Regions:
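Catalytic cores of secreted/periplasmic or lumenal enzymes
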Residues: 53-69
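Structured segments of extracytoplasmic/periplasmic soluble domains
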Residues: 22-26, 61, 116-124
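Low-complexity, flexible helical/coil segments
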Residues: 65-73, 124-129
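Short glycine-rich, acidic/polar surface loops and turns
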Residues: 71-88
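Loop/turn elements at helix/coil->beta-strand transitions in domains of secreted/extracellular proteins
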Residues: 25-31, 61-65, 85-87
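Active-site/substrate-binding loop(s) of hydrolase catalytic cores
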Residues: 1-52, 56, 90-102
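His/Asp/Glu-rich mid-to-C-terminal helical/loop segments that flank catalytic regions of hydrolases
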Residues: 99-129
Length: 129
């Protein structure tokens, strides 16, 4: 479906190109993308997975499992980890069976699960980058 389309390859879509251009300008130590839904964390790929401990720390905090994907799906995180070779994570929030309005209705659950994520990322950058 169109809602699942992320592009043919990293940086193929205008909104992704704009975000990539901004990222190249500011050169962050890591990227953290939030999407809905699934209650999972996607880190780099099996062959490009810099700093897997960051995903594991966030997984321990949120209770969401962390996975490496087998290859690029064309998204922002995919582009970032393969060009910067720095940590890039996508956190999918909300139960898979929830509709998008249900995610909004359950935002207190989502926020509670993700309360420590930014602190974990900041500590990680301070200690490792």
């Amino acid at each position: 479906s169109p809602s699942d389309y992320v592009g043919m390859y990293p940086r193929s879509e205008p909104e992704t190109r704009a975000l990539c251009d901004f990222t190249e300008k500011i050169q962050p130590s890591l990227t953290l993308s939030y999407h809905a839904k699934g209650n999972v964390i996607y880190r780099g790929f099996e062959c490009v997975n810099p700093y897997p401990q960051l995903a594991e720390q966030i997984s321990a905090s949120t209770g969401y499992p962390a996975y490496s994907s087998s290859g690029s799906s064309g998204g922002y995180k995919d582009w970032y980890v393969t060009t910067a070779y720095k940590p890039g994570l996508t956190v999918e929030v909300g139960e898979s069976e929830w509709s998008y309005p249900q995610i909004q209705d359950n935002m207190d659950i989502v926020l509670a699960a993700n309360r420590q994520v930014l602190d974990i990322c900041a500590r990680f950058v301070q200690d490792n980058m």
